[in-house]
Swiss-Prot record:
DNA-binding region: 1115-1195
Organism for this UniProt entry: Schizosaccharomyces pombe (strain 972 / ATCC 24843) (Fission yeast)
Binding site for FAD: 509-551, 558, 572-573, 1147, 1156-1157
Gene name as annotated: lsd2
Compartment list: Nucleus
Class in the EC hierarchy, top level: oxidoreductase
Protein name stated in the entry: Lysine-specific histone demethylase 2
GO annotations of cellular component type: chromatin; cytosol; Lsd1/2 complex; mating-type region heterochromatin; nucleus; pericentric heterochromatin; subtelomeric heterochromatin
Family annotation (PANTHER family): FLAVIN MONOAMINE OXIDASE, LYSINE-SPECIFIC HISTONE DEMETHYLASE 2
Similarity comment: family membership: Belongs to the flavin monoamine oxidase family.
């Protein structure tokens, strides 16, 4: 029985009031009647539709979102579509067509997002046992106002700890994580009244007990911010951005008190049209975000109700990671550093009763980069600042990654020779490659995905170039190295259908040596195999496994830290142990390695091996320690006390500081003049600047100019000594001042810092030659490398004695009669160990053995003294001793053999909190009594007390003393390696490339700091880079690169040509650009314009922060009432057209076509009289009237906005005028003025010369005399 109009309205009213949910499709006529009912019902009518803001507690403070967006008068009757009415029936109010929310497209740039924690490091990015090393203070990869990857409204948020089990989560933490298993936009826009319903629902249905089994690994419980909350709020502030292309807000859901998360997800899918599939979501069946929480498995468990996480049952006996620092003995010890007694409590020592093989463990579930496998978007990774400044920062980041930002490396050119043949394409390749390096330097705690790398492109036609640069940077170890975790989203190829369970084969890579080179090699190989896992699965084999064979019971090699003892020992006990003990005393306090699992629990530690880091020689390690691992590295600041043995006095501290500045300038200048690839203009500029510096520092210099022609003919060290002689004679330096410079030369050579500072633009930082020390010891670096994100498979006490390579296998024989059969071998031990103790079959090539023989290792002897209290002056960084041998060497006298055996003694009190002095023994200046350890300690102690004791403090009680020697054993050759063939400048031009820091000999690979050790970085960083470089040959042999030739296809080539024409890059002339920058006037104008642009940008940002964004003009309404009638009556007319066609054809299943429906619409419209058309005409008139009101309001708001913005701009401009001009701009201004004066002077001189020349050419013959009276004939 058909229902009348009033019956349909009653039904609609019933469904609206009860908020019932429909699973079946409603009849179109019912939808139409609901629309009319919604139109004729007042907004504030309690029996009408449910408005979303009315469900909040303060429903009088906010107007209807629909009314604000579509109507000025809230009491005006509303015409809505059938879809809007259906959404109202399903439980939500009338939603705005253009919602006030963030853009939910996965890779649409959202520069207005206020969620500052989107790209910051999540809690779970570090192991839960390494809590105090969570670098939450680090800046995110993108600024707080720029977040390129906006995924729903909770992308890349850390997984809440309280959902995994019982925890003491606070109220803020509990309320911030109620969206697990719910649509993101629904969870982030809950009204307060309904939010409590969901909180009760989740309290009653704990996800930790139902959805997630107990075997899921726990996350870190450390707070993500200083507020103490265990989670980050989804929105840190109000969202002001309105995007018309954003995915619309979904309606408010039904009451969830009796619904499970799967039912909520099903309801969520029913409410969303299947025709719209944002790229944020995984597939057509699931509308859950790809990274709803940190772990990918969690989103799969919510989506599919299955948790495919393998059980994490721990093995019975597992060798612990190198997480414990051994306690230093309270007794003064001597003897060899590698003595067995000394290694009993070393770092990473294996506990008693454990087996030597460490089984592999399940990979920890670290948070991965959000949405790295979705569709890329051009410009998504570029910040909102100007491209010019961004490319400058990108070029600087490339230098920090050991890349020339404007040239291809030799191995890069070999790899890409067939693909980068066009200079214009090469120009864009450099910009893209440098920008990817900027992403890595900005935040190395997250691995860079291919999609994120493609986001640095300004146009999508450059995506192939980004893939090319990304492939090169990943394979050669310039990015994505260290303690990183990779999931399936980082695989470089598409999945071929092969899974790890169906694969049957697996290769093995063995790394011999667990020093820094071996550990970073194993960790990098593990990461590369994870990123290229699909390449192995496509061949029906598992990614290769990596094992490490270590000869000793600890890891770290020459990185060796020991915890300082707490107890104090008397002086009598010290003398007794010093004279009678050659090992650690049994009476000293010991620390069980099992009890210490976190280096942060160690109060203080001292390094017996590598200790100091210097910039820029160790920039890569410093970036890894500071930004990725969160290891605190402090600079050793303070003054230096220097004692001259010849003059028997302590030099003036002001004079020492002045000479230290001179030494730094000498090192910078020689670095510029030494490299043959430095442009002549840059060299001339540095010569003039250095000459000006010397003239200002030493006014009594000679009148002649400083000549440095010898720097082009000798090695770096020889050039430095020649420069010291010339500067000393030119500046009239005294004998003590020259000895100080030579002493600086000797100290730099001993500290392994005497290398040319190889930078392209000679941009020397102010903190060069300032030593940096890792608090709690440098052994935290190898401890982290072998422990995170999953422990490496290390086999201890495996002394390899023979390596046999036959056919496709490599056999490793150990001294304990054990044998390993692997596919490839990496030798990462010391050169003397594998050249003397390891037999190779077949033998090593001649060029390898010759290179090893050319390396000279310094012994690395070190003395450490611990006192009861500091007896020296405060704020003293080091104590220097200028020996008599320097004076004898300067005067060409014979050495009497009584010179001091130390050059510098470091004060470690500010870094360790314990009065400790560390001295490196100079192997070239040893006294006659230095062979005996006890005499060495007593002599050094007496020297310090006699020359550097403060008069106000007479107490100098020595508690402990340790002496280490890294050359008196068969495993280590010494501490630092030095080349014997370092006189060739061409060797320094290699810029310590990764590919030239290892040998790839088929299945045998050799890595270490002794390979091409003449490059410009210290031994420690060379060891690190060598371990990275050896992985390139391995991954290339196992997973070859797959790139198309040419790299840019025909279609992309056309798009690129059009893009280049639009951007006018074809007219780029590097020579003209270089000539333009040579002028100081042009450089000053650019610098000034850059400052003005920066002020303008800050000005606009200030206006935006204070006033928000400029109001958007209202959309113009439709002026044709028939179109409104057609939209609202489509379903009715289609039903009428269907009935007419069935009546004409006699077919009960006949359907009318679109044209027939349109004809029916036109016919019914024409049949309406004026009264029937009046509602539609009135609605159009009302919309026009509302539009007129909106226009007036928009004009008023715009005028007010512009007036206030102009006032803010004027105030900010007045403030900027009062600020002083930056020093670099003022310097350029002075140089530009001087250049202009010189130009004018030159111009005047040329004019004067031309006048003089014209006067000489002019001769007066009297013909122009006015008194001449000619006779006319």
């Amino acid at each position: 029985m058909p229902l009348g109009r009033s019956s349909w309205i009653c039904c609609a009213k019933y469904f609206v009031n009860t908020k019932s949910r429909f699973n079946e499709i409603l009849p179109p006529r019912f939808t139409l009647i609901v629309s009319f009912y919604s139109m004729n019902t007042s907004e504030n009518d309690p029996d009408g539709h449910y408005d979303f803001p009315e469900m909040t507690e303060h429903h009088s403070d906010r107007a209807s979102s629909y009314a604000n967006a579509n109507n000025v008068n809230s009491t005006q009757p509303q015409l809505v579509s059938s879809e809007q009415a259906l959404l109202a029936i399903l439980g939500g109010g009338l939603q705005s067509i253009t919602p006030n929310s963030v853009n939910q497209n996965a890779y649409s740039r959202s520069t207005y997002r206020t969620d500052g924690g989107l790209n910051s490091q999540p809690v779970s990015s570090l192991n839960n046992q390494w809590g105090n090393y969570n670098p939450a203070f680090l800046p995110s990869r993108y600024d707080s106002s720029f977040h390129p990857y906006t995924i729903s409204q909770a992308a890349n948020q850390p997984f809440p700890q309280h959902l995994l089990g019982n925890s003491n989560a606070g109220v803020a933490q509990q309320s911030g994580m109620r969206t697990i298993g719910l649509p993101p936009t629904v969870g982030s826009s809950f009204p307060q009244q309904k939010s409590s319903t969901y909180e009760n629902f989740f309290d009653a249905n704990s996800p930790s007990s139902q959805q997630f089994p107990s075997t899921y690994p726990s996350r870190s419980q450390n707070p993500l911010s200083s507020s103490g909350d265990g989670s980050t709020a989804i929105h840190a502030g109000p969202i002001q951005h309105q995007n018309s292309n954003a995915f619309s807000n979904y309606p408010y859901p039904l009451d969830a008190s009796h619904l499970s998360s799967q039912q909520l997800l099903s309801m969520y899918r029913d409410q969303v049209s299947h025709g719209v599939t944002p790229s944020t979501f995984r597939n057509h069946e699931s509308f859950m975000p790809t990274q709803l929480v940190s772990a990918t498995e969690l989103s799969k468990s919510v989506d599919n109700a299955v948790l495919p996480i393998p059980p994490t049952t721990a093995p019975a006996v597992v060798s612990p990671p190198a997480s414990s620092f051994p306690l230093m003995s309270s007794a003064a010890t001597s003897g060899n550093i590698s003595s067995p007694a000394l290694f009993d409590s070393e770092l990473g020592a294996r506990p008693e009763g454990s087996v030597a093989i460490e089984p592999s463990r399940v990979l920890l579930q670290w948070s991965s980069q959000s949405s790295s496998h979705t569709i890329p978007s051009a410009g998504a990774s570029i910040p909102t600042s100007s491209l010019k400044s961004f490319f400058e920062h990108a070029a600087e980041a490339a230098r920090k990654c050991n890349l020339d930002p404007r040239a291809l490396e030799s191995f890069e050119q070999h790899m890409l020779s067939d693909r980068l043949h066009d200079p214009v394409v090469l120009f864009h390749y450099f910009q893209i490659r440098n920008s990817i390096c900027w992403l890595w330097i900005k935040n190395p705690t997250h691995a860079i995905s291919r999609v994120e790398a493609q986001g640095v492109c300004v146009d999508r036609c450059l995506f192939q170039l980004a893939s090319l640069a990304y492939e090169f940077l990943v394979r050669y170890g310039y990015i994505n190295y260290g303690c990183l975790s990779f999931d399936s989203s980082f695989t470089n190829e598409t999945n071929t259908g092969t899974t790890s369970s169906s694969a049957s084969k697996q290769k093995t890579i063995a790394v011999v040596g667990a020093g820094l080179t071996g550990l970073i090699c194993a960790r990098q190989l593990t990461g590369l195999f994870s990123q290229y896992s699909s390449s192995f699965l496509s061949k029906n084999e598992l990614p290769p496994k990596v094992i490490i064979l270590e000869a000793k019971e600890r890891t770290g090699g020459r990185i060796y830290s020991r915890a300082l003892p707490v107890s104090h020992t008397s002086a009598t006990q010290i003398n007794h142990h010093t004279s009678n003990s050659n090992s650690i005393s049994s009476n000293s306090t010991s620390l069980n390695p099992k009890d210490v699992t976190d280096p942060s629990h160690i109060p203080s530690a001292i390094d017996l091996g590598f200790q100091f880091l210097f910039s820029p020689m160790d920039d890569i390690l410093l970036n890894l320690l500071n930004k990725q691992l969160g290891i605190e590295v402090t600079e050793m600041t303070g003054s230096d006390l220097v004692y001259d043995e010849t003059d028997t006095k302590v030099l003036d501290m002001v004079e020492v500081k002045k000479l230290n500045i001179l030494w730094e300038k000498l090192l910078e200048y020689v670095s510029v003049c030494f490299f043959i690839n430095v442009e002549e203009s840059v060299r001339i500029s540095w010569i003039s600047q250095f000459q000006l510096f010397i003239d200002e520092m030493f006014p009594d210099h000679l009148s002649k100019s400083l000549s440095l022609n010898a720097s082009h003919e000798f090695s770096f060290k020889k050039t430095m000594l020649i420069l010291i002689d010339e500067v000393s004679s030119y500046a009239k330096l005294g004998n003590s001042q020259k000895k100080f410079l030579i002493w600086c030369f000797k100290v730099a050579e001993l500290d392994d810092t005497l290398y040319p500072l190889n930078t392209v633009d000679t941009d020397f930082s102010k903190d060069i030659l300032i030593p940096k020390v890792a608090r709690r010891g440098l052994s935290q670096l190898p401890w982290a490398l072998q422990s995170y994100p999953s422990p490496l498979n290390i086999h201890y006490e495996k002394f390899v004695s023979k390596v046999t390579i036959e056919n496709d296998k490599c056999t490793l024989d150990c001294k304990d009669n054990s044998s390993y059969e692997v596919d490839q071998v990496v030798i990462a031990c010391s050169p003397s160990h594998f050249s003397s103790n390891i037999e190779f079959s077949p033998g090593l090539p001649n060029f390898v053995t010759e290179n090893i023989k050319s390396i000279d290792f310094k012994p690395g002897k070190k003395v450490i003294l611990r006192y009861a209290a500091a007896f020296w002056r405060k704020n003293i960084r080091s104590f220097g001793i200028i020996p008599k041998s320097l004076s004898q060497e300067m005067n060409n006298d014979e050495n009497d053999g009584k010179s001091c055996f130390v050059l510098r003694i470091w004060n470690m009190l500010p870094e360790t909190g314990v009065p400790i002095l560390v001295a490196d023994i100079n192997p070239q200046m040893t006294s006659s009594s230095s062979n005996e350890t006890s005499h060495l300690i007593q002599e050094l102690h007496s020297l310090i007390v006699d020359h550097f004791q403060n008069d106000s403090n007479s107490s100098a009680d020595l508690l402990d003393a340790w002496v280490t020697n890294w050359s008196r054993n068969g495993v280590y050759d010494g501490l630092n390696s030095y080349p014997n063939f370092a006189n060739d400048k061409q060797q320094y031009e290699k810029r310590f490339r990764q590919s030239q820091l290892s040998y790839n000999l088929g299945r045998l690979h050799i890595a270490g700091d002794y390979i091409f050790s003449c490059v410009g970085c210290r031994t420690l960083q060379r060891s690190f880079l060598s371990g990275l470089s050896v992985c390139t040959g391995i991954i290339d042999s196992l997973a070859p690169i797959s790139l198309t030739i040419p790299i840019i296809g025909e279609t992309s080539r056309k798009e690129l040509d059009q893009f280049l024409r639009n951007s006018k890059v074809n007219n780029f002339d590097p020579n003209a650009e270089a000539q333009r920058h040579l002028s100081y006037q042009a450089r000053y104008r650019l610098k000034k314009q850059e400052r003005l642009d920066e002020h303008k940008e800050e000005q606009e940002q200030l206006v935006t922060e204070l006033l928000g964004y400029l109001p958007e003009p209202p959309s113009k309404p439709n002026a044709n009432p028939f179109l409104l009638y057609q939209k609202m009556q489509w379903h009715v007319c289609r039903a009428l057209a269907d009935e007419d066609k069935r009546r004409l054809t006699g077919d009960s299943t006949a359907k009318a076509t679109i044209n027939e429906t349109r004809a029916k619409l036109g016919k019914t419209w024409r049949q309406l009289d004026d009264l029937g058309k009046k509602p539609w005409i009135d609605e159009i008139a009302a919309q026009r009237e509302a539009y007129a009101g909106k226009i007036l309001r928009y004009q008023r708001l715009t005028k007010e906005y512009e007036m206030r913005a102009e006032q803010i701009r004027n105030d900010y401009a007045a403030k900027c005028q009062d600020e002083p001009i930056p020093d670099d701009e003022a310097r350029l201004f002075m140089q530009a003025q001087r250049e202009e004066e010189q130009r004018k002077q030159t111009q005047d001189d040329n004019i004067s010369k031309s006048r003089e020349a014209s006067d000489e050419e002019y001769h007066d013959d009297g013909s122009s005399d006015s008194g001449y009276n000619g006779t006319r004939y």
